Structures are given as structure tokens and as C-alpha cells.
Amino acid sequence: MRDRPFYLPRNGEMKLQFFHVSDLCRFITILMDKHPVQHLFNLGNPEIVTVKEWVTLCYEAVGKLPTFVSVDQTHHQRDYFCFYDYEYVLDVSKQSSLMPVTLSLKEGLREEYVWYKDHPESVYNRKPYLEYIERHISVKL
């Protein structure tokens, strides 16, 4: 794994919320077992992080420390970064009333890294983010 700086949109302040697939499966099982009156739930980990915090956790999962390069708005965020330029934070209190414990983002990222490392043939990069960065915004550190 090469050491690369991370090209951070807008100083990394946008908020993100994730949900591990194992928690989704557990929640579906809870719904089937409990048959709650409510049928609509916002699902997500109650842990809200900024892009910068998320990237730091991703790097930690692989035993690295990130170096950040801020990217200004002259570049469209989706050309070099996987998330759209908007944030959302869901109220997951109703989910939490049925399932109070979820996998931490840090642990989920660690598990996913191990899986991806063991299954490189399953990794498919849909967008050429690195190519865009190298051609249009790369800086020498």
C-alpha cells in the first residue's frame, strides 16, 4: 500500500453517517422477530463523523497516518472523491430503541479492510479518482 496524501474536499468538514451491513442484517432480524407497529425507520450508526475524521479512521484501519491536501471548489468533488457534495444526518433514535448497540465505525472499517485485503479480485474501482487527481490536482509533498 503506497503512502499518498488524501485530497480533501472543502477542508473535510462535511458530515457523514454510515451503517454496517451486519447491523442492517441484525435490524432486519429484529423487525421480523418483534413486528413493531412502526414500519419506517431511519437506519444508520448514531456516530456522526466529518470527512476528515472518516479518512483518518480509514487510514488508521490500515496502520497509516493521513497527510491531507485541501482541494478548492474549482474541482467538482465527485471527480476526485466518492461522496456527493452534501451532508445528511439521520435521526436514528427509533432504530436505537430497538437496537441500541451498533458496530463502531472504527471496527467496521477495520473489518472491511481485512475483507478487501483478502479479496482483491472483488475490488472494483468504478471511477478513476486517482487518475483525475494525478492529472488535475496532484501536488508534490
Labelled PLM ranges:
Residues 1-7, 15-42, 48:
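Alpha-helical substrate-binding/gating segment
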Residues 9-14, 73-77:
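Short linear capping/connector segments at secondary-structure termini
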Residues 11-13, 46, 100:
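Structured loop/turn residues at secondary-structure junctions
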Residues 21, 75-102, 107-111, 121, ...:
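Conserved C-terminal active-site "lid" loop/helix of NAD(P)H-dependent oxidoreductases
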Residues 105-141:
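Amphipathic terminal alpha-helices
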